Amino acid sequence: MRRRLPRRHAAPARSLLAAAHAALQSPESHRMDGAVLADPIMERLRRRYPMYHETAYLFILAALHFTIERLGEARHITGREMATGCRDLALERYGPMARSVLDYWGIRSTRDFGEIVFALVDLGILVKQEGDSLDDFDGIFCFAEAFEQNYPWACPRPIEQD
């Protein structure tokens, strides 16, 4: 998934950039780390996809940015890369509470990441390539393992005895 418009839409991209900048200044927008969705877009998401908290959509946009930065280049992101980026960002931000935070937003599996990505595609916020599918997000990892069993708990240091 990527946020860039194809070249043939270069002129509208400038107006989208201006609109995004204006939305940042607007009190009627929703934001998370630079990811912004204006109220009309968020309202459409709430109506069409009520199963996810509005913050989940912002988190997915932030995770897309996080994943692209980590890869070091702006390019198409696969479902697996996106799901892994979402996991890593959630662990980085929310630590041992990551699974609970995602659950509160309605995200309980990697497929939910895909559902949100494709909701954003449906509204024209993100674009997909021809071969992209919601199934690309199925079963990438188990939430219980990723957020609980394999959480990188810090091992306590042994007490030094005299």
Name each model-derived stretch.
Residues 31-162:
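Non-transmembrane, aqueous-exposed alpha-helical and coiled segments at domain scale
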Residues 8, 12-32:
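Short, Lys/Arg-enriched N-terminal segments with co-localized hydrophobic residues
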